[in-house]
Amino acid sequence: MTLTMSTVVFFSLILLTLGLQPKDKDEGVMGRSRLGKRGLLMRSLDEELKSNDCPEYCPHGNECCEHHECRYDPWSRELKCLDSR
């Protein structure tokens, strides 16, 4: 089977797209994917919400809900709104 360059590019894009899909944890709304600096996959964190409509992440100094504070999570390496109680 002979593959043309456009076919190779097409399948490469499909594989790349499938590899960049965010994993659905327990959040209600998944954010969009985008390729960030250093080629790392990042979610549109300002749009991703927990099931109680509070943001899970707090990039760019966004406010967290009541009884939550913005802290660095070493496991995910992201700023998250974590329960302060």
From Swiss-Prot:
| Pro-peptide positions on chain | 21-43
Cellular localisation: Secreted
- Protein keywords: Cleavage on pair of basic residues, Disulfide bond, Knottin, Secreted, Signal, Toxin
Q: Can you list the GO cellular component terms from the UniProt entry? A: extracellular region
Tissue localization of expression is: Expressed by the venom duct.
Q: List the disulfide bonds.
A: C54-C65, C58-C70, C64-C81
- In the record, what terms sit under GO molecular function? toxin activity
Q: Where does the secretion signal sit in this chain? A: 1-20
Record's domain comment? The presence of a 'disulfide through disulfide knot' structurally defines this protein as a knottin. The cysteine framework is VI/VII (C-C-CC-C-C).
What name does this protein carry? Augerpeptide-s6a
The species is: Terebra subulata (Chocolate spotted auger)
